[in-house]
């Protein structure tokens, strides 16, 4: 059986080399409303303003020997992958639906810089995912 505490500790140590921890903050209003201690994890204070960066980091570090990454996302995961491509200095292709808000596309490009290429395709995530599968089947 795996020692998940040790694995979590390893992941935390590795992630701290890339970005700082986000704080827990007690929410006075919700605590009073529900008569309980309500704390919020402030992922909005991470570099990409989302917890999705953690998933992108952990997935990509497992394959750090790869020279490129591909993903399909309509938003926050795309930004996490873009940020990590720049951090790891690896190339990435990010497929996003054509319906993705321009602000989300621009932020993704800013996070990834010259390390990423954004491809707008299809109206829905499933369309993007199918294009990713097709691209990867040719690799």
How would you describe each model-predicted region?
Residues 1-139:
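PLP-dependent amino-acid enzyme catalytic core
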């Amino acid at each position: 059986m795996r020692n998940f505490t040790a694995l979590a500790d390893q992941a935390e140590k590795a992630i701290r080399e890339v970005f700082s921890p986000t704080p827990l903050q007690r929410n006075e209003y919700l605590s009073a409303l529900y008569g309980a201690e309500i704390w919020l994890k402030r992922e909005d204070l991470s570099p990409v303003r989302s917890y999705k960066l953690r998933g992108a980091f952990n997935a990509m570090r497992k394959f750090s020997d790869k020279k490129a990454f591909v993903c399909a996302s309509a938003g926050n995961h795309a930004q996490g992958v873009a940020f990590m491509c720049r951090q790891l200095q690896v190339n990435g292709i990010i497929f996003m639906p054509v319906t993705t808000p321009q602000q989300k596309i621009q932020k993704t490009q800013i996070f990834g810089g010259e390390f990423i290429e954004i491809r707008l395709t299809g109206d829905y995530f499933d369309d993007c995912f199918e294009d990713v599968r097709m691209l990867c089947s040719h690799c």
